C-alpha cells in the first residue's frame, strides 16, 4: 500500500479506504469518508486507531462514487470520536433519488443519543469462526480476557454452519460485479490496474450466471436470517 500507517510505517494501514483512516489518525483532517465492499472501513479504522462507522446498507448515498459492487458497496465515515462520526453521518444519511439503494432513516437525534451514553448494558455476541486458529496467540488471549472479565455482557455462540460459506459467496459477488463495472478499463489498458485487481477481474469474468445467482440468493437469505 502507498498509504502508510501513521503509528508505524512498517505496518499496513488496513485496506482500500486506508487513506481516509490515515488522514484522521495523522491529524491531517478531523473527518473523512470511505467506502466498504469487504471490510474497507472498519478494518482501516481499527488498524489506524480511529473511529470508523459503516452504517447499514442504503443509509448513505453512493452517488458519485466509483462503483465496485452495487450489492455490497456501502459508504462509511471516520473520525476521532463517536460524536464526531455521528455529526458527519447525520449530515450524510438521507434518501437520494440518484441512488435507488438508499432508504429513509430519521438520523436527527444521532448526536443527542451519543451524548446520553448507553441506556442499558450493552450485549455482545462472540463467534469463534474456523479462522480462530489462524489468529496469533496474543490476540486470542486478549479476546479470551474480555470474554472472561465481561461475561455478563458477552454471549459465546457456536458459529452457524452457513458462516463458512460467506467468504466464498462474497468473493463471487465482489469479483463478478467488479469485472462488470471495471471491464471498460480492463479492456482499454489492463496494465494501469493493479495486479490484484486484474486477477480479481479475470476470475470474475469466468463465473457462470448460476454461480452468481446462487451467491445472490445466499446473500439475501443471510440478510433475512
Set out the residue ranges of the language-model regions:
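A short helix-breaking turn/cap at a secondary-structure junction
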Residues: 54-140
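Acyltransferase
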Residues: 137-160, 182-188, 212, 216-225
Amino acid at each position: 500500500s502507498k498509504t502508510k500507517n501513521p503509528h508505524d510505517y512498517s505496518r499496513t494501514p488496513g485496506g482500500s479506504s486506508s487513506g481516509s483512516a490515515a488522514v484522521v489518525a495523522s491529524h491531517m483532517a478531523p473527518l473523512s469518508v470511505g467506502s466498504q465492499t469487504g471490510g474497507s472501513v472498519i478494518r482501516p479504522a481499527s488498524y489506524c486507531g480511529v473511529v470508523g462507522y459503516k452504517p447499514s446498507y442504503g443509509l448513505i448515498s453512493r452517488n458519485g462514487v466509483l462503483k465496485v459492487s452495487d450489492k455490497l458497496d456501502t459508504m462509511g465515515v471516520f473520525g476521532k470520536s463517536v460524536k464526531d462520526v455521528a455529526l458527519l453521518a447525520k449530515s450524510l444519511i438521507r434518501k437520494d433519488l440518484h441512488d435507488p439503494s438508499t432508504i429513509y432513516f430519521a438520523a436527527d437525534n444521532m448526536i443527542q443519543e451519543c451524548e446520553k451514553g448507553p441506556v442499558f448494558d450493552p450485549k455482545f455476541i462472540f463467534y469463534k469462526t474456523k479462522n480462530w486458529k489462524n489468529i496469533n496467540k496474543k490476540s486470542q488471549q486478549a479476546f479470551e480476557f474480555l470474554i472472561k472479565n465481561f461475561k455478563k455482557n458477552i454471549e459465546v455462540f457456536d458459529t452457524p454452519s452457513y458462516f463458512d460459506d460467506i467468504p466464498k459467496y462474497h468473493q463471487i459477488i465482489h469479483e463478478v460485479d467488479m469485472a462488470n463495472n471495471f471491464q471498460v478499463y480492463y479492456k482499454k489498458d489492463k496494465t494501469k490496474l493493479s495486479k490484484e485487481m486484474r486477477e480479481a477481474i479475470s476470475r470474475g469474468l469466468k463465473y457462470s450466471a448460476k454461480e452468481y445467482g446462487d451467491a445472490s440468493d445466499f446473500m439475501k437469505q443471510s440478510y433475512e436470517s
